Amino acid sequence: MESEPDQSFKDLSWFLQAIKDPQQTFFNLQTLSFSSSGNTTHCQLITESSMNINVTRDNLTSLSQIFIELATSLETQTSLRNLEFEGIFWEIELLQSLGLLLDNTSKIKQLAFRKNRFSEQCLNELSEILKRNRFLKEVMFLESSIGYRGATLLGSALQVNDSLEELQIWEDSIGSKGAEELSRMIEMNSSLKLFSIFDSSPFTATPLISAVLGMNREMEVHMWSGDHKRDRSLKLVEFLPESKTLRIYQIDISGSCRVAAALGMNTTVRSLDMTGAKLNSRWAKEFRWVLEQNKTLREVKLSKTGLKDKAVVYIAAGLFKNKSLQSLYVDGNRFGSVGVEDLLCPLSRFSALQLQANITLRSIVFGGSNTKIGRDGLTAVLKMVTTNETVVHLGIHDDASLGPDDFIHIFKSLQKNASLRRFSLQGCKGVRGDRVLEAITETLQINPLIEEIDLARTPLQDSGKADEIYQKLGHNGRKIDEAETDDSLKDMPLTEPKSVRAFLCGQNYAGKTTLCNSILQSSSASGFPYVENVRNLMNPVEQVVKTVGGMKIKTFKDEETKISMWNLAGQHEFFALHDLMFPSPCFFLIVLSLFRKPSNKEPKTPAEVEEELEYWLRFIVSNSRKAIQQCMKPNVTIVLTHSEKINLQSESFQATVGCIQRLRDKFQALVEFYPTVFTVDARSSPSVSKLTHHIRMTSKAILQRVPRVYQLCNDIVQLLSDWRSENSNKPIMRWKAFADLCQFKVPSLRIKSRNENIQIVETRRHAIATCLHQMGEVIYFDDLGFLILDYEWFCGEVLTQLIKLDVRKQSTGERNGFVSRKELEKTLRSSLQSPIPGMTSKVLEHFDACDLVKMMKKVELCYEQDPSSPDSSLLVPSILEEGRGKTQKWQINTHDCVYSGRHLQCDDSSHMFLTAGFFPRLQVHLHNRIMELKNQHGATYSLEKYLIAITIHGINIRVELGGQLGNYIDVLACSSKSLTETLRLIHQLIIPAIQSSCRGVILLEHIIRPQCVQDLTPPRFRQSQFVSLHRLKEALSSVPAETMYDYQHTWDSVLDSGKTVLRAGFDLARNLLSDDDFREVLQRRYHDLHNLAQELQVPTDENPEADNHVPVTNELEKVDPSFGGIAKGVEAVLQRLKIIEQEIRDLKQEIQGLRYYEHRLLIQLHHKVNYLVNYNVQMDERKVPNMFYFIRAENYGRRLITSMVPGMVALRIHMLCEFRREMHVVEDQLGCDVMQIDNQAVKCLAPYMTNFMKLVTFALRIGANWAAGMGHMIPDLSHTIAHLANPAVMTGAAGAAGAIGVAAALGRNRGRDRDIQEQEQRAAQQWLIDYLREQTCSTGRDIAEKFGLWRVRYRDDGSIAWICKRHMITRAHEVIQVPL
């Protein structure tokens, strides 16, 4: 136990003597504070490292003597680091003596002035001191009224000083002039790392943050405004260089324009958040330039900023040229359909051949009650959803202008989208009705790529129908962070929450409890309004004997904000509890001890610290992934304890710092780190004072960013506290008591008459209780009938004991992990009894044992063997044992069994994992889902610690947890049914249950080698024996249609100590994929070909007979033979074989239909080519070839030119051999140089280039031979066949209108008749004739030399063509040479 610090008062002479005496070894001062108050002069040792010296107002000269003595005795005071001054009225002589002290020491790093007063002469002297000092790192002024003049002098000093790293000016008024002076300092000073200011004027923020951004300073900035005396404060600006995040909470229009101008060439900001700031088109015009010039911005949030149509037009124009922005949030604004159209234009394509203008934006959110999307806006949304290839997250929030039919159209369009993963429709009033539900369900069946649909606060969710959608997506039904809303809740006002949680994460012996106590003590000593005592339900005797290990919660208040410190237990057996404790709003303190145990002096190695920190970061990310998608990244601060025992300059500590920095870089995209790593002595309140200040500021910032709550919740929190005080601190509140409290104390939740709709009031009460649950004030579930008011009691005593239950020691009737309800209740009573003889149990005093069982079932800690029986046995996963040593085999294993497996792996296992609580929860959750099935009779379900074994409908399934820290799940199946039926069961039952239990961690699906499944190969040997499902489908999409059914995937061999465990082999794709997967691949190929056919205007209805092969039929789904119960004999088996054979024939028929469709399109292609070659035989008697193209030399190769731009130089023109049905690129063709392309050339050639590139694209897609020489000249075909016939380019217009121009031009092309097309072809031909004449290449001989082509006439029809020498020889009997 640490001894109490000496609190006795000493006189000043004692202190002067002590600093002169080198024998005073106990005197190890780090912080020395000076104050001027009272009538006595004295000194007081606060802790072993901090002291306060108080002098009376008329005895300030004694401070000069102290400064001089300190200056001359520095060799004995090497530990002094900080000087603090409170209430000092400075005179010039006193300040000069302080300057003497600072000039004679390099040890003092911090100066703090609180409520000091300086004359102008003193400010000048202080400025001179700072100019010549090279050792100070931090200077802080608090309520010291330095004003404009002081800011000017500080700025001039810091223009010279290059060592100061932190400057803080709190609760002062430097004014805009002072801010301008400090901004000039920022332009000159590159060493300042932290700048904080709290000023009465909000206009001080603009010049300061503009200077930081304009000069690309890596400086952390915090700016506040308000009047602290009236408790009014507002954060204006925050810049965190560590996360490269700039947040602007409030700013005037001129200031916002100035900041935008500074952002243009900035390289330090990656995320810009201006949510709630008022902006207009003047700002947007400046911001357009930012989007066009800035290369580092990745995220922009402009929610609720009042933007109108004109402003959004500027932003959209910037998106056309932007190549870096990934996320844009413009919800809650006031623009209409015009704004929506412009906003989505750069993200849309108006032809399959047009290049999407912006391909970097991945997430876009718009909408709001004042955003009127309208008909035109809906059209733009449909076009974007249908054609966009890059957006992953689309959000339309709080919309009231679209109806159910509109959303049905949107979901229908989503069926064709291959990029969108998350679609958010929060608060949209038109998302209602069964037809919308059917549209969503149909879309999810057709498009399997959609991972999340957010229907929070929509009528569809309010009616309870959204649960079906969430289950299909693999989510946990209704979102946890959204309160239920309906018509009865509309008039309930919302407000910011007033409570926040700080989770202290760390292993045992990290010092979390000691640190928590010091934070509370520091907060109390800092003059905060008041501090709540720790919630305490036990008498002092019980506190002494209480076992360590539960969760501790301590609370204090900062103004109106309640901050709860949640001390998570460090022991491994409690990790499963942590999954239940992550609501919003919250942030995390990861506490790491630099020593293995506090009782010894053995420090941890950097690798040990790194391993521990990485675990907790992965743990936080794994549990916060869903929160990332909905709100914000988890906020994490790193704290190193026991730092007083080590040398912070040692190589070992610096190596530890390097390890921490590597992890921060690794997790930067998923976690919002506070840039400072705190090193503290957890026992010392002064040592944690900065950490305490950080906790206060972080809490306020987080509460401004999280979703709002019902205003009534903040009022009811106090009523619940009063109720507990009046009821002997009961931790449990029955629902009847809560209803009575609402009836008597809350008028808006009161039933006023018998004629009133009681159900509406009850709905409101339940909504308030649910909101309190989400805020972390209570624990409440609808069907349990009570509220838990004390988190610490429930988590620290009740759940902790439940997790640690060992029923095996007390149960005599255990059967396969099951225990009877009576035995479990008996065990609960004995485990929860008080350890003090004669004292009643504090748990069972408020909780009945049956309530505990209900709670365990609710949080999926156990399940009932027979839910229909009130005395059913229960299974508690904590009593399960591992199955090591047991023989692993399938229950059925015949020669006709089908073996299949799926490997579900974390998509980012380096940043997240399946937490320890996942698999026990999955064991219960999957059992409950199976029991809910209507046709589950006869199913068996057995468990081991890391295994779930299921038999249902004749299919045996094993679900295995694998990998270090649970990186993957293997689902293995042995079935007497077909592969398709087996995989349908896995995808409809097993995988959704797994996804809904893993807290939003994304799992990627792979196919396990069937031989590994059949032999139950140990997991360590099958790590290389799986292939990505997506990759296999892509491979099938790339092979010719006739080879799809026989496509093979090869497997590598597996060796163990030189011994072959698995031989190399292969499996046919049809034995790895279900018929559903095959049909999906076929549908996508049909879809791609259909789109290309439409672009070529190829008719698809000329051959009605072919249509019989094209559609994918669903006749097989009507075959549903029953395999339950006893087999019905040989006839049933033969019938089943016939069905399987029919499935194979149908699948082969569909593949044959695909190939036939490709053949039809190839014939149409030849017709199109022949038209282009011979569009007018009489035109100058074909004096020059028709089919020409341009290339450019690039990296020792050739690149096909797909678009013409005025001013292009160094091109080369080539021509194709035009022999019918065998057109090709001529090898070794010299070609002819084109020095420059002018505007006239572009106008003539653009329509020709459009038609030519369409044919090239289509030919390459269906494998036409004539395009074989083109493919290698088009590195990325899908993105380069664009800019065709771009009118904006031809007329020199701005690129911002390019996308609209292309859409209009290509739309006109489809409507032109043959005469117009001939005019376009004639213009291109005439340009070629004129050009060749200029190059003196107009004769047949010249063309043969340059292009290797000869003019011939076909013998059969007399048409003219230009063909190569090879065709001249091999097809001489078909042509006659016709020289010019």
From Swiss-Prot:
Gene3D superfamilies: P-loop containing nucleotide triphosphate hydrolases, Ribonuclease Inhibitor
GO molecular-function terms, A-Z: GTP binding; hydrolase activity
Domain COR intervals: 757-931
Location within or outside the cell: Membrane
Transmembrane segments: 574-594, 1255-1275, 1287-1307
Disrupted-gene phenotype: Severe dwarfism combined with twisted and malformed organs, and sterility. Loss of initial meristematic divisions in the epidermal/lateral root cap. Defection in basipetal transport of auxin (IAA) leading to several development aberrations.
Tissue: Expressed in seedlings, roots, leaves, stems and flowers. Present in ovules, prominently in nucellus and integuments.
Organism: Arabidopsis thaliana
Annotated keywords: Auxin signaling pathway, Developmental protein, GTP-binding, Hydrolase, Leucine-rich repeat, Membrane, Nucleotide-binding, Repeat, Transmembrane, Transmembrane helix
Its biological purpose: Involved in the basipetal transport of auxin (IAA) that modulates growth and organs organization. Required for initial divisions in the epidermal/lateral root cap leading to the formation of epidermal cells and a clone of lateral root cap cells, as well as for the maintenance of the radial pattern of cell specification in the root, thus regulating the distinction between the lateral root cap and epidermis.
InterPro entries, per database record: COR-A, Leu-rich_rpt, LRR_dom_sf, P-loop_NTPase
Gene: TRN1
SUPFAM superfamilies hit by this protein: P-loop containing nucleoside triphosphate hydrolases (SSF52540), RNI-like (SSF52047)
Name this protein carries in UniProt: Protein TORNADO 1
